Amino acid sequence: MTLVGDLAKGIVAVLLSKGICELLGTGLTAQNDVHFIGYIAGIFAILGHVFPIYYHFKGGKGVLVGVSVFLGIDWKVFLCLIVIFAVVLVISKYVSLGSIIAAACCPVVTFLFQFWQRGDLPMWYLWLNTGLAALMGAWVIYMHRTNIQRLKAGNENKFSFHSKKA
């Protein structure tokens, strides 16, 4: 249930922000509002997840919320990030390493997909969205700082489908 709730946070933030912009007649076109406004909404969704008021500002790391923002913005970016995460997880057996590397790839993947499909949008807009994606990815990496320390020390827990027997 937590998985579904975390995934819904990012998607709902993007879709709701897009709907509000359309209702208010902001002048943003259907082609670009979902990206720029989606990234802004996504950043706030991640911050709300990481620093929830009702848990005394101690929340999650923002991975699922962050990746679901990309699902709401561009499913191809989402799919690419999931594949990157899965490949790293299968090779290394570290969920945290997969999350960190996928987060680090956010700006690159965002830039490439938006560059290929940008049409007549100016390059500054592409760089703005890439910067916002980088901010989201950097925040997720920052939230994994204890995992990074454990990875360096060699005592991070590996992922397994099998439970450990006592």
Q: PLM features: residue spans?
A:
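Hydrophobic residues within alpha-helical transmembrane segments
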Residues: 4-8, 84, 101-105
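Membrane-helix interface "capping/anchor" motifs
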Residues: 52-58, 87-105
